[in-house]
Amino acid sequence: IGKYVVYWASNLYDNTDENSRKQLTYNRMVYVTTDDFVNFSDPTVWIDVDRRGGAGSGSIDVTVQKVGDTYYRIYKDENTMSLRQEKSTDLTAAIGGAGVKNYADALKCSAWSEVATNIGKGQANGYGKTFTSGEGPSLFKANDGDVNGYQYYLFADQPSYHQGPNHYVPMATEDIASGQWTVIGNKMPEANFPTNSDGGKPRHGTVLPVTRAQYQKVLEAYAPAVAVKSVDALSAETTVGVAPTL
């Protein structure tokens, strides 16, 4: 669309007086546009579905990928605590509005359409339990020639309050348009997760593609002990059973 789109979830109120707020409102997804990250458009409500009642109260945690001319987004329904997938050729098209209580009504006369609901639900999460609910998803394209044969990956946080391991549970698909996602936690053992000082593992993040040279710069700046000396191609000759000298 020629601009960056920045989006987030907000609870909206009629005025700025916090003392006048007698109860929480529901989460709505909101976006602004910018081309310089200095000046931003006025906020626009993007997803407006009142899911109050039951377990939650709105829509949060959108992640988006563009495939050809189509945008795919996955986000959390706070009522069912589940992940849903939609598609559109118009990224900033809004759905829902005042009084809209369900996604079927929200999508009527909208540029967005439903692709999948309850993504991953009921599958073994690969960490000894079942994927029941998730949040903070991160949708990203597989590298060209990915050895696993997948087209896109989806990392979703399954917190302990969703009977999960408190970190990402990976999923994958061979066709993002199908909405068919397979949980592949067995391919990403916990031992391979980075861990911070309090034992926490990755969740609610974003995966960004980088070139090998960019990755080298990141290592040099933040992990010099494991940074390689060069990313240039090289060749070496050796015999069977003897490690090459590089």
List the model feature ranges, each with a label.
Residues 1-227:
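Carbohydrate-active catalytic/glycan-binding domains of CAZyme proteins
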Residues 232-245:
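Short, solvent-exposed loop/linker segments at the N-terminal edge
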